C-alpha cells in the first residue's frame, strides 16, 4: 500500500508524519543542548550546541504553525482518539503539546524582538534590532520561556510513555498510525 499524503481515519499521512518526526528530532536537539549546558557548563561543545538554539527554535516555531494548520485542514479525516476518559485525555494532552510547542518559541521571539538586538538565523537576518529594550516584551519571556520548555519536556515524556503503554501493554496498534 502506497503512503498517502493526507491523513485518513486509519493512519496519519506522509505530511503529518514528516512534521511529527522532524519536530521530534529538533526538539530532542534543543533539549539535549540545554542538558549539555547544565551538565558540562561553559565548553566548546556547549557553545556550539547552544549557538544553534535560536535558529532551531525559529524552525520549530515555523513547523508548529505549519503542523497546526495542516492538522486543522485534516481535522475531519484524522484517526479518531476515541471516547470516554482516555479519549478526552488524548485530546487534552495533544492540545497541551501543541500549545506549548507554539508558546515556548513564540515567547523566545517576543524576548528577542523586545531586546532590540538583531536576530540572525543561519546567516539570514530576521530582525534588524537597533532599538532600546522593551521590558514588557522581555520580562514575560525571561520569566516563562525556560520554565514552559521544561513543562513541554514533561508533556513529551508523558506522550512517549503513553505510546509505550499503547504498544506494550494495551497492544492496540495505535502506534502504527504514526510509524507504519
Label the model's feature ranges.
Residues 1-180:
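Membrane-embedded alpha-helical bundles that constitute the cytochrome b-like, heme-associated redox core
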Amino acid at each position: 500500500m502506497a503512503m498517502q499524503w493526507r491523513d485518513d481515519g486509519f493512519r496519519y499521512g506522509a505530511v503529518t508524519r514528516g512534521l511529527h518526526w522532524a519536530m521530534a528530532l529538533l526538539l530532542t536537539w534543543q533539549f539535549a543542548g540545554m542538558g549539555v549546558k547544565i551538565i558540562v557548563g561553559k565548553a566548546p561543545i556547549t557553545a556550539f550546541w547552544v549557538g544553534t538554539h535560536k535558529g532551531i527554535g525559529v524552525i520549530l516555531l515555523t513547523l508548529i504553525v505549519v503542523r497546526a494548520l495542516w492538522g486543522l485542514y485534516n481535522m475531519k479525516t484524522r484517526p479518531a482518539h476515541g471516547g470516554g476518559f482516555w479519549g478526552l485525555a488524548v485530546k487534552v494532552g495533544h492540545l497541551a503539546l501543541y500549545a506549548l510547542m507554539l508558546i515556548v518559541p513564540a515567547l523566545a521571539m517576543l524576548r528577542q524582538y523586545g531586546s532590540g538586538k538583531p536576530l540572525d538565523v543561519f546567516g539570514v537576518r530576521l530582525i534588524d534590532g537597533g532599538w532600546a529594550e522593551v521590558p514588557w516584551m522581555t520580562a514575560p519571556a525571561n520569566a516563562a520561556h525556560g520554565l514552559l520548555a521544561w513543562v513541554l519536556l514533561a508533556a513529551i515524556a508523558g506522550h512517549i510513555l503513553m505510546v509505550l503503554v499503547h504498544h506494550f501493554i494495551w497492544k492496540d496498534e495505535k502506534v502504527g498510525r504514526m510509524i507504519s
